[in-house]
């Protein structure tokens, strides 16, 4: 029996010829990432155990994205702690408050490549599976072990394959696809399984759209999300590495044709419509027309799910087409990274957002984490392009968050209420 792409990557990383689901392996780590929230916990754990040197300062990426600039004395103290650690350890790849969200910055700086094992002290590290890597989130204590040894144990996960075929309808995006999948599978339906996305629809998707898919694998319990690499992937990775001086050899790994999957879902893309993930669970997915008409207070366009140039283009196109946003709606726009921000500036997108009264923030986690920007008050309703709508995620426990695509979110900003973008 053949192996899936995830099984092959873990076999290679652990020095084995083959592995099977359920096997325990000790894998060599290619890239380890922490940010300003999880990094201090990792550093303090290293100190507690008397570890004075990291295993490889060139394989560690440290980045500030959650509380940037520092929004409290505690946040500032954490930044100071991490900057000191970077200097003491000679960490080569450190991105201070200026660069953006970790899950956008890592691939665009060339830190993720096909066939690699990438771990991050953040649950949405699964995003990087869009590049054919085994990427997963881990805790800060496990990360301390990685910093010290360069290794981590894994139980080889089973793989669920999502075969997505057909053409997406107008106003439907990969965000609608992944929300529809989560609505079908459930928030725990893929617990500790690798969620592999494939089929002709995925092949046609841009890298940005693929990242939206893998980003949300964790929202159905997935150990990782992954897409087998193709020419699009290889071109993106090579260009990013060349641009930022992070070139290194990598191996393009694909699964065997006779690999065995735990489950296979057949997804007909042409039947997917614009949807919302309604409060207060990501799998509470309803077609947009089912819940249309509910007044809203805020729209957030950004995050590691949908803050890329492609997303900003889609959103401003809707807003511009319909002459602006509703008077009673606040719109917070946060580009995912400085590079994406600069591209949007060059295209005039940022100017247009400002023209129509949107608030454009620095690249960061922004309103997604209920800190710094766009905190919701009691009873307020927000349409967000982010990945979680749990109670209290963006502020008050009494607020409501509806997850949607950038197109649908922008349409809601125009209308001032929940709406199917096809009905504007």
Curated annotation (Swiss-Prot):
Name of one Pfam family that matches: Aconitase
Family assignment from sequence similarity: Belongs to the aconitase/IPM isomerase family. LeuC type 2 subfamily.
InterPro entries, alphabetized: Acnase/IPM_dHydase_lsu_aba_1/3 (IPR015931), Acoase/IPM_deHydtase_lsu_aba (IPR001030), Aconitase_4Fe-4S_BS (IPR018136), Aconitase_4Fe-4S_dom (IPR036008), HAcnase/IPMdehydase_lsu_prok (IPR011826), Homoacnase/IPMdehydase_lsu (IPR006251), IPM_dehydratase_rel_enz (IPR050067), IPMI_cat (IPR033941)
The record's free-text note on cofactor binding: Binds 1 [4Fe-4S] cluster per subunit.
PROSITE patterns the UniProt entry points to: ACONITASE_1 (PS00450), ACONITASE_2 (PS01244)
Species lineage: Archaea, Methanobacteriati, Methanobacteriota, Methanomada group, Methanococci
Organism for this UniProt entry: Methanocaldococcus jannaschii (strain ATCC 43067 / DSM 2661 / JAL-1 / JCM 10045 / NBRC 100440) (Methanococcus jannaschii)
Temperature dependency: Optimum temperature is 70 degrees Celsius.
Gene3D superfamilies found in the cross-reference section: Aconitase, domain 3
Keyword Metal-binding: yes
Function of the protein: Enzyme with broad specificity that catalyzes reversible hydroxyacid isomerizations via dehydration/hydration reactions. Catalyzes the isomerization between 2-isopropylmalate and 3-isopropylmalate, via the formation of 2-isopropylmaleate, a step involved in leucine biosynthesis. Catalyzes the isomerization between 2-methylmalate and 3-methylmalate, via the formation of 2-methylmaleate (citraconate), a step involved in isoleucine biosynthesis. Also displays malease activity, i.e. catalyzes the hydration of maleate to form (R)-malate.
Binding site for [4Fe-4S] cluster: 304, 365, 368
The enzyme's E.C. designation: 4.2.1.33, 4.2.1.35, 4.2.1.31
Keywords (A to Z) from UniProt: 4Fe-4S, Amino-acid biosynthesis, Branched-chain amino acid biosynthesis, Iron, Iron-sulfur, Isoleucine biosynthesis, Leucine biosynthesis, Lyase, Metal-binding
Cofactor(s) listed in the protein's UniProt record: [4Fe-4S] cluster
Identification of the protein by name: Isopropylmalate/citramalate isomerase large subunit
Disulfide bond entries: none
Record field: catalytic activity: (2R,3S)-3-isopropylmalate = (2S)-2-isopropylmalate; (3R)-citramalate = 2-methylmaleate + H2O; 2-methylmaleate + H2O = (2R,3S)-3-methylmalate; (R)-malate = maleate + H2O
pH dependence statement: Optimum pH is 7.5.
Pathway(s) where this gene product acts: Amino-acid biosynthesis; L-leucine biosynthesis; L-leucine from 3-methyl-2-oxobutanoate: step 2/4; Amino-acid biosynthesis; L-isoleucine biosynthesis; 2-oxobutanoate from pyruvate: step 2/3
GO MF annotation terms: (R)-2-methylmalate dehydratase activity; 3-isopropylmalate dehydratase activity; 4 iron, 4 sulfur cluster binding; maleate hydratase activity; metal ion binding
């Amino acid at each position: 029996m053949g192996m899936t792409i995830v099984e092959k990557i873990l076999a290679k990383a652990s020095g084995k010829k083959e592995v099977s689901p359920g096997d325990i392996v000790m894998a060599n780590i290619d890239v380890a990432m922490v940010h300003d929230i999880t990094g201090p916990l990792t550093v303090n754990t290293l100190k507690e155990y008397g570890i004075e040197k990291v295993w490889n300062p060139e394989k560690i990426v440290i980045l500030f994205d959650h509380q940037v600039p520092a929004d409290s004395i505690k946040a500032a103290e954490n930044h100071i702690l991490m900057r000191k650690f970077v200097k003491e350890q000679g960490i080569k790849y450190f991105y201070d408050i200026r660069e953006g969200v970790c899950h956008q910055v890592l691939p665009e700086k060339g830190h993720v490549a096909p066939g690699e094992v990438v771990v991050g002290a953040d649950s949405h590290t699964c995003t990087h599976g869009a590049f054919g890597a085994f990427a997963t989130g881990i805790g800060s204590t496990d990360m301390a072990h990685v910093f010290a040894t360069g290794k981590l144990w894994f139980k080889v996960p089973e793989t669920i394959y999502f075969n997505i075929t057909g053409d997406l309808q107008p106003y439907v995006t990969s965000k609608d696809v992944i929300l529809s999948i989560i609505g079908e599978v459930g928030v725990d339906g893929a617990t500790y399984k690798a969620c592999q996305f494939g089929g002709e629809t995925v092949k046609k998707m841009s890298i940005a759209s693929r990242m939206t898919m893998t980003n949300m694998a964790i929202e159905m319990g997935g150990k990782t999300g992954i897409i087998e690499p193709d020419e699009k992937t290889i071109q993106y990775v090579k260009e990013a590495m060349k641009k930022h001086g992070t070139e290194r050899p990598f191996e393009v790994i694909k699964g065997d044709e006779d690999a065995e999957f735990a489950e296979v879902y057949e997804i007909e893309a042409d039947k997917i419509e614009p949807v919302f993930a309604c409060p207060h669970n990501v799998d509470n997915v309803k077609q947009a027309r089912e819940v249309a008409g509910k007044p809203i207070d805020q729209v957030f366009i950004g995050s590691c799910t949908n803050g890329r140039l492609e997303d900003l283009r889609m959103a401003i196109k809707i807003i511009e087409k319909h002459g602006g946003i509703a008077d009673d709606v606040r719109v917070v726009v946060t580009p995912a990274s400085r590079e994406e921000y600069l591209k949007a500036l060059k295209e005039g997108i940022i100017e247009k957002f400002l023209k129509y009264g949107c608030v454009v923030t620095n690249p960061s986690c922004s309103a997604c984490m209920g800190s710094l920007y766009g905190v919701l008050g009691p009873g307020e309703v927000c349409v967000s392009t982010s990945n979680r709508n749990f109670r209290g995620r963006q502020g008050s426990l009494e607020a409501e968050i509806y997850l949607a695509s950038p197109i649908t979110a922008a349409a809601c900003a125009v209308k001032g209420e929940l709406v199917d973008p096809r009905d504007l």
